[in-house]
A protein has these predicted regions:
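Pyridoxal 5′-phosphate
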Residues: 1-156
Length: 156
């Protein structure tokens, strides 16, 4: 069949983007070195954001400091990559998503359906809140999220 040239163009744009990011983290002129540098920098930044979310930043408590918060996959999860799945005890995940979205913080619900059921069903969970971080997010955004969680927990 005919090749999907749009997919190739998109893939090329993604590779070019990673090369551009990598230029900020290496002086090498080699394209592969730049892409590797981008991947390493992105991983380090996302880990820093995830650690701030779990353990706190500045004078803000992290999610692991709230008795009311359960972190799916555990706090000390070396395989965690820029994502925290969580619940607040006694609060419906959909209600938490709405509360955070109402504060301008975009998070998503994951339900025990065809998409996430293979994880949530064995844990006996009907749903959870998924918080994703990426290389373009900042520690200030994590702080805003933690402030919102603090306020939501305090209001319960």
């Amino acid at each position: 069949g005919t090749r999907d040239t749009g997919s190739y163009a998109t893939f090329s744009a993604v590779v070019n983007y990673f090369e551009w990011v990598g230029e900020h983290f290496t002086e090498s002129k080699d394209r592969r070195d730049k892409i590797v540098a981008a991947g390493e920098a992105i991983h380090a930044h996302e880990k820093s954001l995830t650690d701030a979310m779990l353990f706190g930043t500045g004078n803000l408590k992290g999610l692991s400091d709230f008795d009311e918060v359960s972190i799916i996959g555990g706090v000390d999860n070396p395989r965690r990559e820029g994502l925290v799945a969580m619940n607040i005890s006694g609060m419906d995940a959909g209600e938490l998503v709405e509360a955070l979205n109402g504060r301008g913080i975009r998070v998503h619900i994951r339900k025990a359906d065809h998409y996430s059921g293979n994880i949530l069903n064995p844990l006996g969970l009907p749903s959870c809140v998924r918080v994703s971080m990426c290389h373009y997010n900042s520690e200030q955004e994590v702080a805003r999220f933690l402030e919102a969680i603090r306020d939501i927990v305090a209001a319960r």
